[in-house]
Amino acid sequence: MYYDDGIPVFDSLDKLTKPNSMKVVSSDSSEKGDIVLEPLESGFALTLGNALRRVMLSSLIGSAVYGIKIDGITHEFTSIQGVREDVTDIVLNMGMLRCKLNGTSNKCLSLSAKGPCQVLAGMIETDDQCSIVNKDLLICTLGQDVELNMTIYVASGKGYLPVTKYKENEFLKPMNEQDLISFIPVNALYSPINRVSYRVENSRVGQVTDKDKLILSVETDGTISPSQAVDSAARILQEQLQPFISSDISYKKSQVSSPSGYKDLGYDPILLRKVDEMELSVRSHNCLKNENITYIGDLVQKTESEMLRTANFGRKSLNEIKAVLNNFGLSLGMDIPDWPPKDIDELARQHTDED
């Protein structure tokens, strides 16, 4: 791979310190944890830490209650006979409900209770498409023989949608005016992140002690783990940066010294090798086979997100493949013009014969 001025990309990349796989240091709570990445070039920890923190706080997808309906109630500025909390307090409590949607972006839940009792979030009826995380959350307190029937509207989103903008919610569009009369909007905090901070410490590589160590302290709402939060933020950054890579850098045949017979192949001979030669684990090899990825040239054009969508293909397999490709001076997400070449099998045989 070359820059437009002919400078090999990998010549410059190889001079940078590459971090090891991230280390997760969990606390007693599954919602809190430290994510450690080292070693990094001096200054890189600050750059990466700030970017990851901002993305985690602003752009991760989560689920939240955006509205409720209570039988017999048309607005929140009222009270319910026999219920200790007024409707405004109930609305505020529902805004603190943390749930996780699976396989759907919008869900309608039901809650029915009869007093005397404390109505908790764990009493909400759910199915395999929705799970409640904070089941001990107090919603309200019912008196003797008081009944409460509530409909709860949950959706996936990002950021924060206040009640002043609730009509911008796309899931309200199917509702008619009659339905909206008794609909009580709730401030929807979709972000699954409670807080994120980072610090930079020194890291050592051999005798060099001026490298960086990045430590991200992440606290979530329990719907995702700290490591999942960092993983999602990194994927978002990767997708946003991908156009810069594909538009400014193009792949050209490597000019490293190699046998003269390779010059007639038209492609870097490494790309014509079959993935069988990469000596991957059985799981990784089978995943590539199932996706009809035969040559290394086929593989390097896949992005990380595409690979992770492959059945039975996880991050361990991804890291294995990235490490092997890195040894060849290659990476995932490369743009190779005119691939695959005509008569690729014949070209591959030529390469094998030259070997």
Curated annotation (Swiss-Prot):
Ranges that cross the membrane: none
Gene3D superfamilies (UniProt xref): 5' to 3' exonuclease, C-terminal subdomain (1.10.150.20), DNA-directed RNA polymerase, insert domain (2.170.120.12), RNA polymerase, RBP11-like subunit (3.30.1360.10)
Sequence segments annotated as region (Alpha C-terminal domain (alpha-CTD)): 267-355
SUPFAM superfamilies linked to this entry: C-terminal domain of RNA polymerase alpha subunit, Insert subdomain of RNA polymerase alpha subunit, RBP11-like subunits of RNA polymerase
GO molecular function term, any single one: DNA-directed RNA polymerase activity
Annotated GO biological process: DNA-templated transcription
InterPro entries in UniProt: DNA-dir_RNA_pol_insert, DNA-dir_RNA_pol_RpoA/D/Rpb3, DNA-dir_RpoA, RBP11-like, RNAP_asu_C, RNApol_insert_sf
SMART domains per UniProt: RPOLD (SM00662)
Catalytic activity: RNA(n) + a ribonucleoside 5'-triphosphate = RNA(n+1) + diphosphate
Record EC number: 2.7.7.6
Residue span of region Alpha N-terminal domain (alpha-NTD): 1-248
Enzyme class of the recorded protein, top EC level: transferase
A GO cellular component entry from the record: cytoplasm
Keyword terms: DNA-directed RNA polymerase, Nucleotidyltransferase, Transcription, Transferase
Pfam families in UniProt: RNA_pol_A_bac (PF01000), RNA_pol_A_CTD (PF03118), RNA_pol_L (PF01193)
Transferase as UniProt keyword: yes
Domain remark text: The N-terminal domain is essential for RNAP assembly and basal transcription, whereas the C-terminal domain is involved in interaction with transcriptional regulators and with upstream promoter elements.
Subunit structure: Homodimer. The RNAP catalytic core consists of 2 alpha, 1 beta, 1 beta' and 1 omega subunit. When a sigma factor is associated with the core the holoenzyme is formed, which can initiate transcription.
Family: Belongs to the RNA polymerase alpha chain family.
Role played: DNA-dependent RNA polymerase catalyzes the transcription of DNA into RNA using the four ribonucleoside triphosphates as substrates.
NCBIfam families according to UniProt: PRK05182.1-2, PRK05182.2-5, rpoA
Name of this chain's protein: DNA-directed RNA polymerase subunit alpha
